[in-house]
Amino acid sequence: LLAVGASPIMADEVNEVTEIVSISQALLINIGTVNDRTAESMMLAGEKANELSIPIVLDPVGVGSTSYRRQLVQLLLKNIQFNLIRCNAGELAAIAGEVWQSKGVDSGTGEIDIALVAKRISLQYRCFVIVTGESDFITNGYEELHISGGKELATHITGTGCLLSAICAASLASGGTNQLQNLVTTLKDYKQAAEQNTKNVGDFALQFMNRLQELAEVEK
């Protein structure tokens, strides 16, 4: 996030999350390492962000893997108004109640009409939905766009999806009247940053971060 010009702070303590949200311009709720304590913090943070009209992004990491995660995400979506859900196809399927075979935090396997399901979820929860994969998909429930590009090596690095969610939160925090276009630009830049000729995962991760910084500098 620092590479793209954002200034992050990570907080999951119940006694401070509302204060942290109060001085923030966006909130990312990521359930990657969730437990009962952090689940309470997520709810408090989301409610405070809604109160202050601060944009919120949900990254439902591995939501289809366990009933605990599914129930938590359902509760979050019921009680918090999100601006964006950023997920992979498997996570989208779990949120929508579609049949899918999850594989940890990875997308897993299954067959759904991503565009149709994503648009339904977008309308149901009144937020943008981004589904990432070989081709990224974004919708506001009415408009939709596919973004291609990038390299398969990105799928071999843990955290690239979580990083994208954080950058999307920064994009929403930047304001502007056309949030959909801002998010589309973010997705295109992210794909472009992943278009490298490196063959090794370690080299790819390093060059990926360098490229993100370069793109951020160009857009200043």
Task: State each model region's role.
Residues R69-E144:
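Conserved phosphate/ATP/ADP-binding segment of small-molecule kinases
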Residues V34-R37, G62-T66, F137, A154:
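Short, small-residue-enriched loops and turns at beta-alpha junctions
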Residues T38-C87:
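Glycine/small-residue-rich loop that forms an oxyanion/phosphate-binding "nest" at active or ligand-binding sites
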Residues A94, I157-K188:
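Short, small-residue alpha-helix embedded
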Residues T186, Y190-K220:
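Charged C-terminal helix
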Residues L2-L58:
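Conserved N-terminal subdomain of the carbohydrate kinase-like
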Residues L145-T158:
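Short pre-catalytic strand/loop immediately N-terminal to key active-site residues, enriched for Gly-Thr
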